């Protein structure tokens, strides 16, 4: 196998990730893949901001990040959430290392709109050489979405965006979105494979609805460059079976017949 696989864990599912999830990461690595995990941490940041009585607002889904908010975000993402994921991986027998985009200039960013969003950045460069070195040595890097600009100032970055940038920079073959659902269901049955066109049809007919719509559209948007497949899996269960098969819904560029 030997391919880079980027796994994005949203903040909303981090606390509920089961032992089976971490076992699946170990199994994926044992099959020869080279996993890299990118995590969010929105709910944990919200909780700490509330505890410290720091106000926070959102603009078009992005957290407006002032000096105070950034300090809390960096503390929670890098110091708490990141290390929690690393410890759970190590407990499952996975050699892992926790990093942020600041470490080794892993994720260089530029401000999106400082006047409106404050210290919120978008990736302009990923240090793929460092990540390749780590995975070649058997590590699973766990990345917190804090990056630095050209002046080495920290910026808050959307975790989905970081995952996409890492996947592109390292020419990953697959990007896995870890959610709280098994994948896309139709008539209560898991749909194992779809094309982007089939996804849009399921949205139009109402099979895909609510919070799943932005998840699948984000997945489709990620299908660029060498990325051949984006999968949606359940973090509360095994997502990589002993047979070597991914359990979830995989969206691929090329035409797939999901039935039969």
Swiss-Prot record:
Catalyzes the ATP-dependent phosphorylation of N-acetyl-L-glutamate. One of its GO terms (molecular function) is acetylglutamate kinase activity. This is Acetylglutamate kinase. NCBIfam families: argB (TIGR00761). Gene3D superfamilies: Acetylglutamate kinase-like. It is an enzyme of class 2 (transferase). Substrate binds at residues 41-42, 63, 156. The record marks 8, 215 as: Transition state stabilizer. One of its GO terms (biological process) is L-arginine biosynthetic process. It is found in: Cytoplasm. The gene is argB. GO terms for cellular component: cytoplasm. Pathway: Amino-acid biosynthesis; L-arginine biosynthesis; N(2)-acetyl-L-ornithine from L-glutamate: step 2/4. Signal peptide: none annotated. Keywords: Amino-acid biosynthesis, Arginine biosynthesis, ATP-binding, Cytoplasm, Kinase, Nucleotide-binding, Transferase. It catalyses: N-acetyl-L-glutamate + ATP = N-acetyl-L-glutamyl 5-phosphate + ADP. CDD domains: AAK_NAGK-like. Its EC number is 2.7.2.8. Belongs to the acetylglutamate kinase family. ArgB subfamily.
